[in-house]
Amino acid sequence: MAQTEVERVRCLLDELERHQHQRKGAADTQAASLRLHLQEEEHASSPCKGRRVLCELLADEPLDGDAATPTATHALEIPASARRVFASGRQAFEDAADFEAYARTALEQAAFERACSKLSARERPGKDVLNLLVQEGYPAEASQAAVDKAKRCGVISDTRYAQAFVNSKTRSGWGKARISRELERFGLSLEDAGEEALDSLTQDREYERALAAASRRAMPSKNPTEKIARFLMGRGFATGLSLRVAKEVVAQAQEPSDE
């Protein structure tokens, strides 16, 4: 079995074990001094972009004999998208430390599920997913753990993303320099794309793409060489190559026709 398949199986087994543990915790009827309460109302919380939910730890303290009035002993704001994980998990805790340990695990699981949701629409690099989770309000540690798990499961692949990005942008007429700059924004390099994608960025291929891009452009009436060269450099082609191609295109356009 391939290494990636082994990792996917391990992830599935981890998920099965987690769900079994959740059901056991939810069904546990032993006495506990604290219980979980999720407020229904969601609210915005700067600087996070996502909605938030207040998660409280309540203690039933005796008041006026047999009556009991719930008292909040601990509160934690969680992203609204984490509500389902918290609502379906453990509901009773021995103390605040017990709850905090559980909350860390629950937030990691919720962040992982949210990452998978973000990736269902399109491929994203790990750094992009990490930033999205943090912006939504997940702790940095939980967000990083979720991204690492997604990479182990093959849900996130920086190599796969880099390959697709390079192939897409070369078809769009981008030059090597611009592609490299855009990849760096996501913490990636051209080498992450692999040899096959790099083959499309050789000097000969760069020249062909620059020539095709310049040929499709309408010939400027004034300073054509300068304007075409500037256009090519703006698309990420090297300065020397841009000037060379611009001169060739202008010279070809100025050649007298056979008629």
Where are these regions (language model features)?
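An alpha-helical, amphipathic repeat domain used for nucleic-acid recognition
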Residues: 1-259
